[in-house]
Amino acid sequence: MAKKTKKPSNQIAANKKARHEYFIEETYEAGLVLQGWEVKAIRAGKMSITEAYVVFRGNEAFLFGAHIQPLLSSSTHVDPDSIRTRKLLLNRKEIDTLFGAVNQKGYACVPLEVYWKDSLVKCKIGLAKGKKLHDKRKTLKDRDWERDKERGFKQHLD
């Protein structure tokens, strides 16, 4: 029987810090408006969104603080700006929902991951509420407890 080949991951960049710092209430999928050199750099895996966040200006949403390191070979005729503000493509209803929650209810809008969907670059955005220090400690304590519990079951079965 032939071995199954692993399907390559579509994920480009992930914001692991966001799940530690925030409670994620809802997620939305948004498209990214990119330039040609940015797409080539993303294909080479040169993107980071750990310090990125979503900003609303007018009736549009923008990804601010995402870093794309330019390739030397692809951006020779353009002056690349690696921390450029990039427009997010969302429906009007989604923008209104996110904008209302961020302005009134004290929520934040953070990018969770960037990934390929067919040949398009998509960004998963989370509507998030900030965690307090004791919430972060509780999350770590619960994670450790689950790990110890699994270890105990494994030793008990052996």
Curated annotation (Swiss-Prot):
Where does the protein end up?
Answer: Cytoplasm
Does the keyword section mention Nuclease? no
GO MF terms here are:
RNA binding
**Alphabetical keyword list:** Cytoplasm, RNA-binding
Question: Per the record, GO CC terms?
Answer: cytosol
Task: Give the primary localization class.
Answer: cytoplasm
The record's Gene Ontology biological-process terms are: trans-translation
Say yes or no: keyword RNA-binding present. yes
- Which InterPro entries does the protein's record reference? SmpB, SsrA-bd_prot, SsrA-bd_prot_CS
> What's this protein's family per the entry?
Belongs to the SmpB family.
Query: NCBIfam families annotated for this entry?
Result: PRK05422.1, smpB
Q: What does this protein do?
A: Required for rescue of stalled ribosomes mediated by trans-translation. Binds to transfer-messenger RNA (tmRNA), required for stable association of tmRNA with ribosomes. tmRNA and SmpB together mimic tRNA shape, replacing the anticodon stem-loop with SmpB. tmRNA is encoded by the ssrA gene; the 2 termini fold to resemble tRNA(Ala) and it encodes a 'tag peptide', a short internal open reading frame. During trans-translation Ala-aminoacylated tmRNA acts like a tRNA, entering the A-site of stalled ribosomes, displacing the stalled mRNA.
Q: What is this protein called?
A: SsrA-binding protein
Q: Name its species.
A: Psychrobacter sp. (strain PRwf-1)
The gene it comes from is: smpB
